[in-house]
């Protein structure tokens, strides 16, 4: 999902 797209 987009939450993990940044790898934060």
Curated annotation (Swiss-Prot):
It is found in: Secreted. Transmembrane segments: none annotated. GO terms for cellular component: extracellular region. The keyword Kinase does not apply. Signal peptide: none annotated. GO terms for biological process: neuropeptide signaling pathway. Its main location: secreted. The modification Leucine amide is found at residue 8. It comes from the Eukaryota. Keywords: Amidation, Neuropeptide, Secreted. In larvae, expressed in the CNS and midgut but not in the ring gland, thoracic perisymapthetic organs (tPSO) or abdominal perisymapthetic organs (aPSO) (at protein level). In adults, expressed in brain and thoracic-abdominal ganglion but not in corpora cardiaca and corpora allata (at protein level). Belongs to the allatostatin family. May act as a neurotransmitter or neuromodulator. This is Allatostatin-A3. It comes from Delia radicum (Cabbage root fly).
